[in-house]
Amino acid sequence: MRAKRWVIASPDTERVRVLSRETGYTPLTAAVLSARGIDTPQAAADYLSCDVRGLHDPFGLTDMDKAVEVIRDVIDRGEKMVVYGDYDVDGITATCTLVDYLRSKGAKCEYYIPNRLTDGYGLTRPAMEQLYEQGTRLLITVDSGITANEEIAVARELGMQVVITDHHECHENLPDAQAVVDCKRTDDTYPFSSLAGVGVAFKLICALEGDTLSMLDRYADLVALGTVADVMPIVGENRIIVAEGLKKLSVTANIGLEMLLREAGMKNRRLTSSTISYVLAPRINAAGRMGKAELAAELFLTKDPIRAQALAAELCEQNKLRQSEENKILEQTLTRLRREYNPLEDKIIVLAGEGWHQGVIGIVCSRLCDRYGCPVVLISVDEDGVGKGSGRSIGSFNLFEALTSCEDLFERYGGHALAAGLTVQADRIEELRTRLRKYAETHVTMAELVPQLHIDCMVQSEWLTQENIESLSVLEPYGMKNAEPVFCMKNMTVEEITPLSSDRHVRLSLIKDGKRFSAIWFGIGAGGLGFVEGNTVDAAFHLEINEFRGRRSVQLTICDVQLSDCEHLADQKILNLYNTLMQDGPLTAREARLLLPDRKDLVAVWRHVTCRAEDGRLSVPDGALSRRVAWESRRDINIGKLFVCLDVFQESGLISYHFKEGMLNILLKPYEGKADISGSVVLATLQSMAG
């Protein structure tokens, strides 16, 4: 995992003080608001408002009146209508919200959700023909359809009326439908353009019902679920919808949602937007990823508690299968990358595999992107030699533009700067890999691939009280464009490091101004840290109140930890001694002893390098390795002593090593028999200096 570049906001102290005084918010909350450019009482009131009166008139959306007229007419005539959805959480919740409402009004309404694995995204000609043959006379799309001009034309030619509801970007020429309702229409004057697909569907039922508040009361939980899962900005109408939806979620009348909460172990627990993102959405998405989106749709539409419980259990089982497929592909890719990936040269990873599950390669892309700190494209090749791929990017590398430079190789592709999809023939994948590598080499530096961590403000230890932390709840619900606040505190002393869950996570005890803070860092073990007990560090974190056995305490949830300036200064002093040694300069006996490793030090470094190397390679941030070895061996190994150990091994033909872009890169060399380091010049030189 590459280091992050911190971007720390510096809210104006006087503005924070005035905002706190005039609004009654704590200085901590006021500092977060000010850091985000919200530094007047009115701006704060507008930004934080969850007042349902802020919901706009649904008829403000272009063509909404036409959509309502067409749907009412079809209901009155008793003709069959079908809601055409999508297989992700947004599409499923949009489908279920609209179908449930229309059925409650007596509509003959069915739904159709394409199979991710066989149909792909969006409308298809075979689906249009099938639906017409089954008696469909009105097709209503949700979360799809805005660019399906050809498919809509087919539906119209067959004799179906079409109402499109979508939230994706529009092309210049809209489909020829009876109504096209999309908050991103260029000719739309609706005041909020960031609705989810389920948000647009919700607006449609509000228009049909003529009572927005009653529809919010009835469907806010499903609409919030789709809105958060689709990573929509939690501002404006979305903030109101999600705030109301989270209230409803804990007491939901939707039997399917209730059973899913139970199966996920979340019933009677505090529910937040994170609950949706990390607990509910993965289970619902798993159904779509595994080609069984209809399970999730049935779950949210059924009125039978026994059936709902069975479906919720099946969704959780599908999620386990998804995790299994994901981990299988991840292990395969990691094995190959240990052989093929060169961290010194490769700025993009492009891998293809036969039979990889198309529904999960996007998740694996994201995990590899985080692990290696570079863009990743994974391609699943089927038995017909057709590759379907997903890509994820990082930093400032625009993946869509990179793919556009290779567009002659694709059958189709699409996406945006940070995520994309593609279809390519297997015999063109090697050329694609070569061209993407060349593109990355000329369009991005390693420094530009470093991910940024945006920090709202630096805090003082006295600010971290339960009262102040609880006051931050006014900022909720969190999500896109209203992220959970990130704070940082500098020059904290690491008192204790405790591995958790077989060293998959770590708990830290940090000291600042005599105050002890408990911190937890998920997804990293003690052996992967770049610091040890006793080091001084800067920590970036979320703040929360931890409740355990009736006891409440302040807890820091770590986002990142970096060595403080004083540690870098200490390293530099040692490195100056090491550089003097390398330049044949004089060292005092005391200085030489600081650099001179004994046998146990050499063994500790060798053991760490050989155990951590993957296929003979180890790449770590240049200041981290000495501290990791020190942590594991409980020995005093500074950065200069580490380099001397590496020099000894290099002289003996055991390794080679060098630096690039802030990374220390070690390559193990094959050798036979017992390694002999007795002839090391650097070791002999230090021993003579040390006396």
Could you describe each region identified by the protein language model?
Residues V89, L117, G145-I146, H168-C170, ...:
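Conserved nucleotide-binding/hydrolysis micro-motifs of P-loop NTPases
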Residues V142-L195:
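Histidine/acidic-residue-rich, glycine-tolerant segments that coordinate divalent metal ions
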Residues L98, R103, R239-R336, D370, ...:
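Acidic, two-metal ion nucleic-acid-processing modules in DNA metabolism proteins
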Residues M1-K4, E476:
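Catalytic domains of riboflavin
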Residues R137, Q178, D538:
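Conserved acidic residues
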Residues T97, P175-V228, K600-L602:
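Short alpha-helices
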Residues R2, A9-L138, L158-G159, E209-E431, ...:
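Hydrophobic helix-and-loop "lid/oligomerization" segment in the mid-to-C-terminal part
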